[in-house]
Amino acid sequence: MKLIFAGTPEFAAQALQGIVNAGHEVALVLTQPDRPAGRGMALQPSAVKKVALTHGIEVFQPLTLKDAEAQARIAAVGAEIMVVAAYGLILPQVVLDMPRFGCINIHGSLLPRWRGAAPIQRALLAGDAETGVCIMQMEAGLDTGPVLLRGAFPIAATDTTATLHDRLAELGARLVVEALGKLPLPAEPQPADGVTYAQKIEKAEAMIDWSKSAAELDRHIRAFNPFPGAQALFRGQTVKLWQASPVAGRGETGAILAVDKNSIIIACGEGALAVTELQKAGGKRLPVQQFLAGHPLAVGDRFDIPA
């Protein structure tokens, strides 16, 4: 099937690779412009662009799809369908209507739950028992289109955004290839009940509030791993917490209840948190024993409570 692929990050790159491996004709790839990255801030291509170039696929990197020139470039391809995955640009209705089978989107949640930009993080923060991928027929609304295929799996107690991302990307690649092989597929309208929105993650959200329960803070730490990293303040200095688990314990919120070579136990609004991996500002992620060697902490010390 002749198609256009629109996507940018690694989540989308896996889908593109799967589509190519399945033998479909990817006539054009749309992706975000190269961005400065790394210590030297040199321009870096997106993960999708790297895959496209590896396979000799033409790449188009417009700043917007609203101008006539970009729309003409897309129309000239004569694609039967456009596959979209974490692209980053709004597709105007004229673009949605161009391909014979329209545009389909690979969305990393079980719609209608967690429409929007950050479904993985929001599912973890909310304590959802499962997540998955929907292949959705796109329309003008935000992730409101009917669902063609869906797949689900349970969220483990140790899952982070990083681990869920990888599992969802793999599932999304498999489902979109299945969908392309079965078109046209019956479309299931999304129910009106159960709609939630996954707002974009803001860095300020990563700050830990010790008045919350240990279970909530465990989810918080896992949701913000790898970006931007859950943050706590200790004597005014930022410390990132990367791994922790809820344990029994009571004390003044933010107070250190116990310290050993394996963990630091910190009192929460309900229960306590056993932290096992930390990072000081400008430093590396370290297990507790190595962290304590350079940054001693003692029972009775207290993490700052955000204002």
UniProtKB/Swiss-Prot annotation:
GO terms for molecular function: methionyl-tRNA formyltransferase activity. GO terms for cellular component: cytosol. Gene3D superfamilies: Formyl transferase, C-terminal domain, Formyl transferase, N-terminal domain. Its EC number is 2.1.2.9. Attaches a formyl group to the free amino group of methionyl-tRNA(fMet). The formyl group appears to play a dual role in the initiator identity of N-formylmethionyl-tRNA by promoting its recognition by IF2 and preventing the misappropriation of this tRNA by the elongation apparatus. It is an enzyme of class 2 (transferase). This is Methionyl-tRNA formyltransferase. The gene is fmt. Keywords: Protein biosynthesis, Transferase. It catalyses: L-methionyl-tRNA(fMet) + (6R)-10-formyltetrahydrofolate = N-formyl-L-methionyl-tRNA(fMet) + (6S)-5,6,7,8-tetrahydrofolate + H(+). The keyword Transferase applies. PANTHER family: METHIONYL-TRNA FORMYLTRANSFERASE, METHIONYL-TRNA FORMYLTRANSFERASE, MITOCHONDRIAL. Belongs to the Fmt family. (6S)-5,6,7,8-tetrahydrofolate binds at residues 109-112. NCBIfam families: fmt.
